[in-house]
Amino acid sequence: GIKVNIDKKGTILPNNVEAAFDFVNGDIYLKKKPSVINMHHEGFHAEQWLDIGKEQYMNLSRLEREEYVFEQVMKNKHLFDKASIDHSIEYIERLRLKYK
């Protein structure tokens, strides 16, 4: 399973990061009040990690992992506000330019 850790003291995650998925250990880290989109984003990483296994997940490129998350966000966009969707689109487009 996936362990969810709350960064209560703000000592685990950098200030500009609300949530993160540790794919080596299979842990999600959340700040005290993460946005809905960030919770789901990391949850989608965890979902893929569980589906294909740690080893296969670690062999994926960052872009491949983020493309999966983006696809899941778009399938579930009714859960998110417009600003969150727009940010997700901008984020994946930046990564596509950087990694393709």
Whereabouts are the PLM-identified features?
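Catalytic toxin/effector domains delivered as secreted proteins or via bacterial secretion systems
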Residues: G1-K100
